[in-house]
């Protein structure tokens, strides 16, 4: 009990009220997220590894908080060395100013501590991916948020709770009808080819080595993507990892892989080439072997990906990158623009 509210775990019976509160905040522009049906809300917010608390006034739900914990780990990750993830806090307008949001956050932090977590975070590593809408577009969206929208009320609220901003991420957008392959990329691809670096679609039957690149970056994520995508090609099946499926929908089969190769090594990678139901070209990132840096390999791969998206009929693409990341210049030269800024935040428990 705290003032006028009681607090308890969010339950299935609360879904209609919780989804309504969530959707009202989405539709009023308080948050950038896309509205969800009650069924989609329940499917997203009530999964294994998730914790949610409700603030109640009698039978009325006045607010809720939601958090997650990883249940699938990359090499080197454990339950103990990964944070608990704060997903969202919502409080009904009529119930604000009564410390309900603060108490909900405290309950979630206590739950994280009890489960052995040493920190809490708001970042793109959250297993729950919430779609958000690109401002000023005809309903174009992105499949997950990389942190806290710095324009929403939640950002200063979390700062007051002791969350610190570890990193600023910018979300970038391009309508693909505006994309045009630049002649300079044709010349650059030829220059790289003359140096022994081939760029374009990669044939996994070649069996080129990529562990060296992943070790030097270093990135277990990219190792996993390359392992699963090349395996899918060799077996003639779709990628088996649901985390690598756009919209959670199993691909129809192996997908094109774009890579830069040198001798029998993969030294750069982007892809796989795919698109979401919304028409978004599904951008997962670009990696380049540090031993092959400063040769514009990443820029060539990015333009190849944009051309593949356009050829596949994608309507637009979005991505996020560090506000100070030099890759931002690559994306801006290709025609993308900044549409939102997010903060990756963390708090020691």
PLM region descriptions:
Residues 63, 167-170, 268, 340:
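A structural microfeature
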């Amino acid at each position: 009990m705290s003032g006028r509210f009681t607090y308890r775990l969010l339950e299935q019976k609360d879904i209609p009220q919780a989804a309504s509160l969530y959707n009202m905040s989405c539709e009023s522009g308080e948050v950038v997220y896309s509205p969800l049906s009650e069924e989609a809300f329940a499917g997203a917010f009530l999964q294994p590894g998730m914790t949610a608390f409700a603030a109640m006034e009698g039978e009325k739900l006045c607010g809720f908080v939601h958090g997650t914990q990883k249940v699938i780990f990359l090499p080197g990750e454990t339950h103990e060395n990964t944070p608990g993830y704060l997903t969202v806090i919502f409080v009904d307008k009529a119930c604000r100013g009564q410390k309900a949001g603060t108490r909900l956050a405290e309950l979630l932090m206590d739950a994280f501590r009890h489960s052995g977590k040493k920190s809490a975070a708001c970042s793109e590593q959250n297993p729950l991916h919430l779609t958000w809408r690109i401002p000023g577009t005809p309903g174009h969206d992105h499949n997950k948020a990389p942190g806290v929208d710095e324009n929403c009320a939640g950002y200063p609220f979390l700062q007051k709770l002791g969350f610190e901003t570890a990193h600023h991420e910018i979300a970038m957008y391009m309508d693909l009808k505006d994309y045009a392959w630049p002649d300079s990329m044709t010349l650059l691809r030829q220059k790289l080819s003359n140096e022994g670096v081939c760029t374009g679609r990669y044939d996994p039957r070649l069996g080129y080595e990529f562990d060296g690149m992943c070790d030097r970056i270093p990135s277990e994520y990219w190792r996993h993507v390359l392992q699963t995508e090349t395996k899918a090609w060799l077996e003639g099946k779709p990628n088996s990892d649901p985390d690598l499926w756009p919209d959670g929908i199993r691909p129809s089969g192996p997908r094109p892989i774009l890579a830069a190769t040198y001798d029998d090594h993969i030294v750069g990678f982007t892809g796989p080439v795919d698109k979401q139901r919304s028409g978004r070209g599904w951008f997962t990132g670009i990696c380049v072997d540090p031993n092959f840096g400063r040769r514009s390999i990443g820029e060539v791969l990015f333009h190849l990906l944009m051309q593949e998206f356009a050829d596949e009929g994608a309507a637009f693409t979005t991505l996020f990158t560090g506000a100070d990341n030099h890759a931002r210049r690559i994306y801006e030269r290709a025609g993308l623009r900044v549409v939102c800024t997010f903060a990756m935040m963390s708090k020691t428990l």
